[in-house]
Protein backbone atom coordinates (compact mmCIF):
# COMPACT_ATOMS: atom_id res chain seq x y z
CA UNK A 1 0.00 0.00 0.00
CA UNK A 2 1.23 3.50 -0.85
CA UNK A 3 2.40 5.61 2.06
CA UNK A 4 0.59 8.85 2.99
CA UNK A 5 2.27 12.16 2.20
CA UNK A 6 0.32 13.93 4.96
CA UNK A 7 0.51 13.20 8.69
CA UNK A 8 -2.55 15.24 9.69
CA UNK A 9 -5.40 16.47 7.50
CA UNK A 10 -8.55 18.55 7.82
CA UNK A 11 -11.28 17.08 5.63
CA UNK A 12 -14.10 19.46 4.64
CA UNK A 13 -17.30 17.72 3.56
CA UNK A 14 -20.22 19.77 2.31
CA UNK A 15 -23.68 18.95 3.59
CA UNK A 16 -24.76 18.38 0.00
CA UNK A 17 -22.19 15.59 -0.26
CA UNK A 18 -24.19 13.63 2.33
CA UNK A 19 -27.54 13.78 0.58
CA UNK A 20 -28.88 11.19 -1.82
CA UNK A 21 -30.49 11.53 -5.22
CA UNK A 22 -33.67 12.99 -3.72
CA UNK A 23 -31.63 16.03 -2.67
CA UNK A 24 -32.77 15.99 0.94
CA UNK A 25 -31.39 14.93 4.30
CA UNK A 26 -28.68 12.31 4.77
CA UNK A 27 -28.13 9.22 2.64
CA UNK A 28 -26.92 6.47 5.03
CA UNK A 29 -25.13 4.63 2.22
CA UNK A 30 -23.07 7.71 1.31
CA UNK A 31 -22.29 8.36 4.97
CA UNK A 32 -21.14 4.78 5.50
CA UNK A 33 -18.91 4.88 2.41
CA UNK A 34 -17.27 8.07 3.67
CA UNK A 35 -16.73 6.46 7.07
CA UNK A 36 -15.00 3.48 5.44
CA UNK A 37 -12.75 5.80 3.40
CA UNK A 38 -11.84 7.78 6.53
CA UNK A 39 -11.11 4.48 8.31
CA UNK A 40 -8.60 3.62 5.56
CA UNK A 41 -6.68 6.80 6.37
CA UNK A 42 -6.68 6.11 10.11
CA UNK A 43 -5.32 2.61 9.45
CA UNK A 44 -2.53 4.22 7.40
CA UNK A 45 -1.59 6.34 10.43
CA UNK A 46 -3.10 9.62 9.20
CA UNK A 47 -4.59 11.94 11.83
CA UNK A 48 -8.00 13.14 10.62
CA UNK A 49 -10.07 16.19 11.53
CA UNK A 50 -13.44 16.66 9.81
CA UNK A 51 -15.64 19.70 9.24
CA UNK A 52 -19.15 19.15 7.86
CA UNK A 53 -21.44 21.66 6.21
CA UNK A 54 -25.16 21.75 6.90
CA UNK A 55 -26.65 22.68 3.54
CA UNK A 56 -28.41 19.34 3.14
CA UNK A 57 -30.56 20.17 6.16
CA UNK A 58 -30.75 23.96 6.30
CA UNK A 59 -29.43 27.02 4.47
CA UNK A 60 -29.64 30.17 6.57
CA UNK A 61 -28.53 32.53 3.80
CA UNK A 62 -31.58 31.67 1.65
CA UNK A 63 -34.04 32.31 4.46
CA UNK A 64 -32.21 35.54 5.28
CA UNK A 65 -33.06 36.75 1.76
CA UNK A 66 -36.70 35.91 2.50
CA UNK A 67 -36.67 38.10 5.59
CA UNK A 68 -35.35 35.92 8.42
CA UNK A 69 -32.75 37.59 10.61
CA UNK A 70 -29.35 36.44 9.32
CA UNK A 71 -28.04 35.74 12.81
CA UNK A 72 -30.99 33.45 13.57
CA UNK A 73 -30.61 31.70 10.23
CA UNK A 74 -26.90 31.15 10.77
CA UNK A 75 -27.52 29.74 14.25
CA UNK A 76 -29.95 27.26 12.70
CA UNK A 77 -27.34 26.37 10.10
CA UNK A 78 -24.78 25.72 12.84
CA UNK A 79 -27.19 23.29 14.50
CA UNK A 80 -27.59 21.53 11.15
CA UNK A 81 -23.84 20.87 11.11
CA UNK A 82 -24.14 19.32 14.57
CA UNK A 83 -26.81 16.93 13.26
CA UNK A 84 -24.55 15.95 10.37
CA UNK A 85 -21.70 15.53 12.83
CA UNK A 86 -23.77 13.19 14.99
CA UNK A 87 -24.60 11.12 11.92
CA UNK A 88 -20.95 10.97 10.87
CA UNK A 89 -19.79 10.02 14.36
CA UNK A 90 -22.34 7.20 14.42
CA UNK A 91 -21.19 5.90 11.03
CA UNK A 92 -17.57 5.98 12.18
CA UNK A 93 -18.45 4.12 15.38
CA UNK A 94 -20.21 1.44 13.33
CA UNK A 95 -17.08 1.18 11.18
CA UNK A 96 -15.05 0.60 14.38
CA UNK A 97 -13.40 4.02 14.19
CA UNK A 98 -12.88 5.92 17.44
CA UNK A 99 -14.34 9.40 16.84
CA UNK A 100 -15.09 12.48 18.91
CA UNK A 101 -17.64 15.16 18.03
CA UNK A 102 -16.90 18.70 19.20
CA UNK A 103 -19.16 21.75 18.97
CA UNK A 104 -18.12 25.40 18.86
CA UNK A 105 -20.71 26.07 21.59
CA UNK A 106 -21.96 24.06 24.55
CA UNK A 107 -24.39 21.23 23.88
CA UNK A 108 -24.21 19.32 27.14
CA UNK A 109 -25.21 15.69 26.84
CA UNK A 110 -24.83 15.68 23.06
CA UNK A 111 -21.17 16.38 22.34
CA UNK A 112 -18.08 18.02 23.80
CA UNK A 113 -17.36 21.72 23.51
CA UNK A 114 -14.42 22.52 21.22
CA UNK A 115 -11.13 22.64 23.08
CA UNK A 116 -7.93 23.08 21.11
CA UNK A 117 -5.57 21.15 23.40
CA UNK A 118 -8.05 18.28 23.80
CA UNK A 119 -8.51 18.10 20.02
CA UNK A 120 -4.74 17.88 19.50
CA UNK A 121 -4.47 15.17 22.16
CA UNK A 122 -7.18 13.08 20.51
CA UNK A 123 -5.69 13.48 17.04
CA UNK A 124 -2.35 12.23 18.35
CA UNK A 125 -4.21 9.21 19.73
CA UNK A 126 -5.48 8.53 16.18
CA UNK A 127 -9.06 9.45 17.02
CA UNK A 128 -11.06 11.18 14.30
CA UNK A 129 -12.20 14.59 15.53
CA UNK A 130 -15.35 16.09 14.01
CA UNK A 131 -15.67 19.86 14.40
CA UNK A 132 -19.29 21.07 14.30
CA UNK A 133 -21.32 24.27 14.80
CA UNK A 134 -19.06 26.28 12.53
CA UNK A 135 -16.90 28.86 14.25
CA UNK A 136 -19.71 29.50 16.73
CA UNK A 137 -20.32 32.90 15.14
CA UNK A 138 -22.77 34.02 12.44
CA UNK A 139 -21.60 35.33 9.05
CA UNK A 140 -18.84 32.70 8.78
CA UNK A 141 -19.13 29.75 6.41
CA UNK A 142 -18.12 26.18 7.10
CA UNK A 143 -15.29 26.71 4.60
CA UNK A 144 -13.99 29.37 7.00
CA UNK A 145 -14.40 26.85 9.82
CA UNK A 146 -12.40 24.27 7.89
CA UNK A 147 -9.52 26.66 7.27
CA UNK A 148 -9.61 27.97 10.84
CA UNK A 149 -9.64 24.52 12.45
CA UNK A 150 -7.05 23.28 9.96
CA UNK A 151 -4.70 26.09 10.97
CA UNK A 152 -5.41 25.60 14.68
CA UNK A 153 -4.69 21.87 14.67
CA UNK A 154 -1.63 22.42 12.45
CA UNK A 155 -2.94 20.19 9.69
CA UNK A 156 -0.69 19.62 6.70
CA UNK A 157 -3.52 20.38 4.29
CA UNK A 158 -7.21 21.24 4.02
CA UNK A 159 -8.92 18.72 1.75
CA UNK A 160 -12.12 20.12 0.27
CA UNK A 161 -14.38 17.33 -0.96
CA UNK A 162 -16.72 18.38 -3.76
CA UNK A 163 -18.87 16.87 -6.52
CA UNK A 164 -16.39 17.78 -9.28
CA UNK A 165 -12.83 16.60 -9.97
CA UNK A 166 -11.13 19.82 -8.83
CA UNK A 167 -10.97 23.49 -9.78
CA UNK A 168 -11.96 24.41 -13.34
CA UNK A 169 -11.61 27.63 -15.32
CA UNK A 170 -15.42 27.66 -15.68
CA UNK A 171 -18.40 25.59 -14.61
CA UNK A 172 -17.91 22.06 -16.04
CA UNK A 173 -21.65 21.40 -15.71
CA UNK A 174 -22.31 24.21 -18.20
CA UNK A 175 -19.23 23.92 -20.39
CA UNK A 176 -17.94 20.44 -21.37
CA UNK A 177 -14.68 22.06 -22.53
CA UNK A 178 -13.91 23.46 -19.06
CA UNK A 179 -10.23 23.14 -18.15
CA UNK A 180 -9.23 21.33 -14.96
CA UNK A 181 -6.30 22.86 -13.11
CA UNK A 182 -3.85 20.50 -11.41
CA UNK A 183 -1.87 23.15 -9.53
CA UNK A 184 -2.64 26.77 -8.69
CA UNK A 185 -1.05 29.52 -6.64
CA UNK A 186 -3.21 31.46 -4.18
CA UNK A 187 -2.75 34.62 -6.28
CA UNK A 188 -3.94 32.85 -9.44
CA UNK A 189 -7.18 31.80 -7.77
CA UNK A 190 -7.92 35.38 -6.73
CA UNK A 191 -6.80 36.96 -10.03
CA UNK A 192 -8.86 34.52 -12.12
CA UNK A 193 -11.81 34.71 -9.69
CA UNK A 194 -11.98 30.92 -9.50
CA UNK A 195 -14.67 29.50 -7.26
CA UNK A 196 -12.77 27.49 -4.66
CA UNK A 197 -14.35 28.75 -1.44
CA UNK A 198 -15.53 32.09 -0.09
CA UNK A 199 -12.91 34.85 -0.04
CA UNK A 200 -12.71 35.11 3.77
CA UNK A 201 -11.91 31.40 4.07
CA UNK A 202 -9.49 31.43 1.16
CA UNK A 203 -7.51 34.45 2.31
CA UNK A 204 -7.26 32.95 5.81
CA UNK A 205 -5.66 29.84 4.30
CA UNK A 206 -3.40 31.95 2.09
CA UNK A 207 -2.23 34.19 4.93
CA UNK A 208 -1.24 31.16 7.01
CA UNK A 209 0.26 29.18 4.14
CA UNK A 210 -2.32 26.40 4.47
CA UNK A 211 -2.40 24.27 1.29
CA UNK A 212 -5.83 23.38 -0.10
CA UNK A 213 -6.67 20.36 -2.24
CA UNK A 214 -10.01 20.17 -4.01
CA UNK A 215 -11.17 16.75 -5.19
CA UNK A 216 -14.24 14.68 -6.02
CA UNK A 217 -15.38 12.69 -2.98
CA UNK A 218 -17.92 10.96 -5.20
CA UNK A 219 -15.12 8.93 -6.81
CA UNK A 220 -14.51 5.79 -4.75
CA UNK A 221 -10.95 5.76 -3.42
CA UNK A 222 -10.29 9.41 -4.31
CA UNK A 223 -9.63 10.41 -0.69
CA UNK A 224 -6.95 7.73 -0.29
CA UNK A 225 -5.40 8.71 -3.62
CA UNK A 226 -5.16 12.35 -2.54
CA UNK A 227 -3.55 11.45 0.78
CA UNK A 228 -1.03 9.09 -0.83
CA UNK A 229 0.13 11.70 -3.33
CA UNK A 230 -1.64 10.52 -6.47
CA UNK A 231 -2.31 13.33 -8.94
CA UNK A 232 -5.95 13.68 -7.96
CA UNK A 233 -7.87 16.95 -7.89
CA UNK A 234 -6.36 20.45 -7.70
CA UNK A 235 -3.63 21.59 -5.31
CA UNK A 236 -3.53 25.25 -4.24
CA UNK A 237 -0.51 26.58 -2.38
Curated annotation (Swiss-Prot):
Catalytic function, reaction form: UMP + ATP = UDP + ADP
Enzyme Commission identifier(s): 2.7.4.22
Pathway note: Pyrimidine metabolism; CTP biosynthesis via de novo pathway; UDP from UMP (UMPK route): step 1/1
Region of interest called Involved in allosteric activation by GTP, as start-end residue ranges on this chain: 20-25
Keywords: Allosteric enzyme, ATP-binding, Cytoplasm, Kinase, Nucleotide-binding, Pyrimidine biosynthesis, Transferase
Cited Pfam families: AA_kinase
GO terms for cellular component: cytosol
GO biological processes: 'de novo' CTP biosynthetic process; UDP biosynthetic process
Signal peptide feature range: none
Residues involved in ATP binding: 12-15, 55, 59, 162, 168, 171
Gene Ontology MF, one: UMP kinase activity
Its job: Catalyzes the reversible phosphorylation of UMP to UDP.
Family named by the database record: Belongs to the UMP kinase family.
Assembly mode: Homohexamer.
Record-given protein name: Uridylate kinase
Taxonomic lineage: Bacteria, Pseudomonadati, Pseudomonadota, Gammaproteobacteria, Pasteurellales
